Amino acid sequence: MITSTLLKEFTKELGADLCGIASIDRFGDCPTGFHPTDVYRNTNSVIVIACRIPGSSMNISSPYPYTAIENIVSARISQIALSLTLYLEKNGYHALLIPSDPYDYWDAETMTGKGILSLKHLGYKAGIGTIGKNSLLCNNEYGNLIKLGAVITDAVLTADPIVTAKLCKDTCTLCIDSCPVGAIGLNKVVSQKKCREFSEINNKRGIEIYACHACRSVCPNRNGR
């Protein structure tokens, strides 16, 4: 029998910096089509893992190191999630990796994409952190410099407490004010069209690079508390 403690130790051995668990009863407020049981009907637990992004990548003018780091960390998370899925199956459970990309929902006019499940909302429900005004999940130890992955499973696991402490100060609007294209609203909603058109660009070789991370870098909680 797998326990939450054993599972977390396993994810740390694989290279995850954080691991949180949510029970399925926490997802009653999910939109239709984006509930974990809409993906796998026998889901009992949602496991969320996170790997941190090196803070030094925020302090350079060239977008290429940050882009490379984003891609490397994303690939690492996918590998950890796959290994976790196989580990659960080996122990007699069903499990499914939830990718951040590719995803099915896409509105071309607004350039709005939605993952099959929202990883940041899964992370919140699993106690990884809280969602900041910049719409990024913010962890107390690593701030918003984290990338997320998830696995849903029929294993019944002990859930972690949801983080109730507010990391964003009521009076702070640094991320909103610093966005070059005004993509961040006061209600934690980001205009994906404005953000993508400015921050996701193709260089002369046709390679996509991430040209802006202002909302991450100006946050006082960028590196955690």
Residue positions per predicted region:
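Catalytic cores of enzyme domains
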Residues: 30, 36, 66-67, 72-225
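Non-catalytic, usually N-terminal nucleic-acid engagement modules in DNA/RNA processing proteins
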Residues: 1-77, 82
